[in-house]
Amino acid sequence: MKEKAVVLDDQMIRRALTRISHEIVEHNKGVDQCVLVGIKTRGIFLAKRLAEKIGQIEGKEIEVGELDITLYRDDLTLQSKDKEPLVKGSDIPVDITKKKVILVDDVLYTGRTVRAAMDALMDLGRPSQIQLAVLVDRGHRELPIRADYVGKNIPTSSEERIEVDLQETDQKDRVSIYEK
């Protein structure tokens, strides 16, 4: 795979997350009834960063949960030998019933991950509303899903791949486009 371009660097990612944080606060008229839920793996780190920024804006903490959607995927990724799904587990520290849940993920592509996340959430409670925040929206939807908060729209071809590197997992913050 050949890197075509770096489309977001660390400063651009920081700015995008700051803007999304302000949009979440403004859209929800505060965050009293909100819970951020990151989709494993990179969505969790982005949710934690958003929570920190929202805390600075509002002067109060917002709960952050972790959602593992492995068993909800219709294109389940299996371990090669055992053919068993690799499940890491979800951790949502509060009851999400009647809360506004803001799902957080790194890239929105076909919409299948978000659909699986909504199915997983509904098994954990009945939120009053589900919103979606993504760092990158690259288009090519297969399902009627749209993000409420987008860091950057990056139109791509189906021959390209978006890769998100985050400090917590990759020792750097950047988003790149690769040719397949």
UniProtKB/Swiss-Prot annotation:
Residues spanned by motif PRPP-binding: 101-113
Domain of life: Bacteria
InterPro entries to which the protein is assigned, alphabetical: PRibTrfase_dom, PRTase-like, PyrR, PyrR_bifunctional
Catalytic activity: UMP + diphosphate = 5-phospho-alpha-D-ribose 1-diphosphate + uracil
Keywords, ordered alphabetically: Glycosyltransferase, RNA-binding, Transcription, Transcription regulation, Transcription termination, Transferase
HAMAP family (UniProt xref): PyrR
Protein name: Bifunctional protein PyrR
